[in-house]
Amino acid sequence: GETLAHNLCKKTVPYEPGIWFNSAKFFDIEYQTYGTVPSTWDEAETKSFYWEHSPGKVCFRMLMNTNHQILGVNNFGFRLRHEFFDQAIREKWSGEKVIAKLDKANFDPEFFAPYYLEIQKAFKAQFGGNFQPAKKSFIQKLFGASV
């Protein structure tokens, strides 16, 4: 929108789309994509981390290159912050760093189950990592839902 406005006002500005982002909500279903997450990928060049909540209505996938730098994320059934993943992808964070800080990406953490705790445990089990899984905040302990 901003680029279009500049160009309509005769101030030529190049279009720089930035990191791909898409978010959709249909009734109570949340779905978000950050960065590049194709439906298929070359397993020799791309590492995949996938976590699914046991009832099957919430999941998280992160793709990384062979250096374990984040390429993109899909999440289904819970909300995460766009700004967090925009920064992580732009700055080429490692998958470990993304997962270690995943509590910072949690949207409305006081009111939703802290899925990031289970995601962090699953990532450590699959890829290892030198981080401690986050803990619930005082507000989450007091009012929040559980996983």
Question: Can you say where each PLM-predicted feature lies in the sequence?
Answer:
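Mid-to-C-terminal Rossmann-like scaffold of FAD/NAD(P)H-dependent oxidoreductases
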Residues: E2-E83, P133, F138-V147
